[in-house]
Amino acid sequence: MNSAIIVFPGTNRERDMAKALTLVGGKAPQMVWHRDSALPAGLDLVVLPGGFSYGDYLRSGAMGARSPILDAVRRFAEAGGHVLGVCNGFQILTEAGLLPGALMRNRDLRFICRDVHLRVETIASPYTSAYGLGEVARVPVAHHDGNYFADDATLAQLADEDRVAFRYCAADGTVGEASTPNGSRDAIAGILSANRRVLGMMPHPENLVEPALGGIGGRALFQSIVESLS
């Protein structure tokens, strides 16, 4: 599987993402700078990693979505390419119009950095096929603007089209306000595009892929990608 990670000024999770992709897929991704105007040929996957692109000036993801490389990422996605956006990458995807909704300031107005539980809401995607439907996975979050918002019509469409990939939940899989760390509507932690080839999610699966790091809750996401795209 050939993959590339987009690196912006302020990105800080590109090496974690590269390690996870290499560990599970056996091949290191290419790093692509934000000022580039084209993606490498022959890619199967483009990743927008976490961090604070352009220092989160204006608002999280706003400047990243308007960087030179995003035109190429948009063309790649529109041509049916697979794109994964994690944390700041999810924010960029919504700002770029590749996913619906917006990521707002957390409910309590504080930066959140801790492990959370996610419930897998669909396995009909190249990002979740190695999970079990309804499986609960423990993964970290680290964000200030992770409160997913969309209007009622968009939320209904996401649900009707089975495009909610992950919801925040308690350890037993119960979904509710108490287990949603940032106030996201419908406890949404990750969503898919209409063609199911673009995934945006706030939690960081790349940080829990091997037991030595404290767990493997994120590993099945990378297994899904490798098995689906190789």
Curated annotation (Swiss-Prot):
Keyword GTP-binding found: no
InterPro entries for this protein: Class_I_gatase-like, PRibForGlyAmidine_synth_PurQ
Domain Glutamine amidotransferase type-1: 3-230
Record pathway: Purine metabolism; IMP biosynthesis via de novo pathway; 5-amino-1-(5-phospho-D-ribosyl)imidazole from N(2)-formyl-N(1)-(5-phospho-D-ribosyl)glycinamide: step 1/2
Keyword hit for ATP-binding: yes
Active site per database record: C87 (nucleophile), H204, E206
Subcellular location: Cytoplasm
EC code(s) of this entry: 6.3.5.3, 3.5.1.2
UniProt keyword list: ATP-binding, Cytoplasm, Glutamine amidotransferase, Hydrolase, Ligase, Nucleotide-binding, Purine biosynthesis
One GO CC term, this protein: cytoplasm
Single GO BP term: 'de novo' IMP biosynthetic process
Disulfide bonds: none
SUBUNIT field: Part of the FGAM synthase complex composed of 1 PurL, 1 PurQ and 2 PurS subunits.
Function: Part of the phosphoribosylformylglycinamidine synthase complex involved in the purines biosynthetic pathway. Catalyzes the ATP-dependent conversion of formylglycinamide ribonucleotide (FGAR) and glutamine to yield formylglycinamidine ribonucleotide (FGAM) and glutamate. The FGAM synthase complex is composed of three subunits. PurQ produces an ammonia molecule by converting glutamine to glutamate. PurL transfers the ammonia molecule to FGAR to form FGAM in an ATP-dependent manner.
HAMAP family in UniProt: PurQ
NCBIfam families (alphabetical): FGAM_synth_I, PRK03619.1
Protein name: Phosphoribosylformylglycinamidine synthase subunit PurQ
Biological source species: Rhodospirillum rubrum (strain ATCC 11170 / ATH 1.1.1 / DSM 467 / LMG 4362 / NCIMB 8255 / S1)
Gene: purQ
